[in-house]
Amino acid sequence: NIYIFRKKELIHIRKGQVMEELIKEKVNKGLLSKEAALRISDTDKAYNCIGRDDYVKPLVSKEEIKLKKKDIIVMTTAGLQKNISVRELEDILVKRHRCRETAREIIETVKRKDNEGLDNLGLILIGI
């Protein structure tokens, strides 16, 4: 998932936009049927290009996102996302520490919970 943290609010950048572009490309090339494309749910399936042998080029969204000073780009893995609420993320991000300190606090908050999926905790924060 990708978010922009702006003015005390976490704005979810549509997680399906890259998946939709990939599906459209596969259908157009005849590598995926339209029926199969319709069955794919971007909430139930994760498509990870990192480390894939068949990864050829990055997908670029046609949707432009204008960043503002003091925005924070927040990228999370599914494992982290399942173990912390948006509200909890906002409460930590609003403190405005350095990104490294904020990332540590988010990871530690998740680790304190007794939840499943803690082996897949990934987080990237980019301050603008």
Residue ranges and their predicted role:
Residues N1-I2, E20, Q81-K82:
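Short, acidic Gly/Pro/Ser/Thr-rich loop/turn segments
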Residues N1-K7, I11-I13:
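Conserved catalytic micro-motifs used in adenylation/nucleotidyl-transfer and phosphoryl/amide-
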Residues I4-R6, L22-K26, S85-V86:
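A short, polar/proline- and glycine-enriched secondary-structure boundary/capping micro-motif
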Residues K8, K15-V18, L89:
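Residue-level structural signal for beta-strand termini and adjacent loop
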Residues L10-I11, D44, I124:
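A broad, low-specificity signal marking well-ordered, structured residues that form hydrophobic/aromatic
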Residues R14-L67:
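Conserved, helical-rich catalytic subdomain that frames metal- and/or nucleotide-binding sites
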Residues N48-G51, Y55-T76, L80-I128:
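C-terminal catalytic subdomain
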